[in-house]
Curated annotation (Swiss-Prot):
Cysteines paired by S-S bonds: none
Annotated spans, Disordered: 103-126
InterPro entries from the UniProt entry: Ribosomal_bS6 (IPR000529), Ribosomal_bS6_CS (IPR020815), Ribosomal_bS6_sf (IPR035980), Ribosomal_S6_plastid/chlpt (IPR020814), Transl_elong_EF1B/ribsomal_bS6 (IPR014717)
Protein name: Small ribosomal subunit protein bS6
Source species of the chain: Glaesserella parasuis serovar 5 (strain SH0165)
Family classification: Belongs to the bacterial ribosomal protein bS6 family.
Length: 126
């Protein structure tokens, strides 16, 4: 089986449907004997340029190992699902399991807030 990196962007008004979509897509990969190596929900992010007069979208990244027929099925689902604004499926040479730069940047932004909370907690204890 081949390895793929899949990114899809969902309409911001349909963000509550994203967990269900992720569940369906991962289930179809696993049913075919594939494996999900990495799954990241990046949340709502600003678009570089407007798509259908929208300036934000909900991003999801998946790294999967699956047969070609499953990937074709996923691409068809993306194409006919009105909530999916854009999708990209790339063939990769190996499975990628480490956190993506987007997720690392998100964690780094949260880290200073956590440090401030720790300092405030220490000050409260004294």
């Amino acid at each position: 089986m081949r390895h793929y990196e899949i990114v899809f962007m969902v309409h911001p008004d349909q963000s509550e449907q994203v967990p269900g979509m992720i569940e369906r897509y991962t289930a179809s990969v696993k049913e075919a004997g594939g494996q999900v190596h990495r799954l990241e929900d990046w949340g709502r992010r600003q678009l570089a340029y407007p798509i259908n007069k929208l300036h934000k979208a909900h991003y999801v990244l998946m790294n999967v190992e699956a047969p070609q027929n499953v990937i074709d099925e996923l691409e068809t689902n993306f194409r006919y699902n009105d909530a999916v604004l854009r999708s990209l499926v790339l063939h990769t040479k190996a499975a990628v399991t480490e956190a993506s730069p987007m997720l690392k940047a998100k964690d780094e932004r949260k880290a200073p807030e956590a440090l401030v909370e720790e300092v405030e907690a220490e000050d409260a204890d004294e």
